[in-house]
Amino acid sequence: MAICLSDTCFGHTLLFIGKTKLLLLMAATLILQHSTTAADGAAGAGNSSLAKPGCRDKCGNVSIPYPFGIGKDCFREGFEVYCSTPDKVPILNTSGTPLLEINLNFGEARIQNNISQACNITKFNMVLGASIPVQRFFMVSRTRNIFTAIGCSTIALIAGEIQTPIEEDGGFIFDGISACGSFYTEDIIDNTTKDCSGRGCCQTAIPRNLKSFIPFFLNNSLLGAQIFSPCSYAFIAETGWFAFHPSYVTSQNLQNQFGFGPPLVLDWVAGNGSCEASRKMGSSYPCIDANSECVDVPNGPGFRCNCSTGYEGNPYLAGGCRGQSACTHLRN
């Protein structure tokens, strides 16, 4: 039984404990704290236990828990991570972008996106920006990201996967499209505004089930906007990351102003079917720990694995879910 010598565990009852019993209790607590510290140290070193045994658990400062992994036989199919040298930057194989963080509990991965731009569009035209493919077990999180466009006389669109080519006119049908418009004239620029509501900057929700995306720009040079705002920008980023400033509408290289690209949150699943169907996968069933459970994800087809109530760790590894101590429950 764990003993916690704190108000959290005992309240003011310590005032009524005899001196001898109190000293014994304090001694027992010190011994327990020593053993707990040692255990915590082992668990800290064993954050490597979140990786597959014998495999690297980090690339730079980013922890790489299984089913992700670095090197042969260290990852589940579709979750390979490259660790670039000498910078030690983890690269997610499915998108080819830097990996910032992996969250096992929520089934999320933060990657570094880029900012698409189109400059000096002198007539009504559509320009394609840079695209990022997000494949197989990954999807752009609709609840954790937002689509942003910056510029004057700009309409930006974000399109999902190309589903069907249209033979008659050479066009395509996309899985989903979101758009927002940004209009600003030089004489009404307010250098104090930080609002992203359509004057120089606009934001909108992204389409559902977005696995790959391509930014488009429509610019019709309204009121000679090209003279003072030559470029239009668009990007998907983690909600709350971006703060608009009016100077961005006149920038000719917004990416350089931020140094690195915006963070983008991906949802990932262990499989694309349902929990019921996944249990027929046999040896390839990913929730292999005895104290794990399968959970159908709410935001699209697929499932992921969680440790059962009272356990924590990595449900994708045998023995990966460990029992939580009584003190851990009290702290939570």
Where would I find each of the regions flagged by the language model?
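Typically disulfide-stabilized, N-glycosylated extracellular/lumenal ectodomains of secreted
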Residues: 2-332
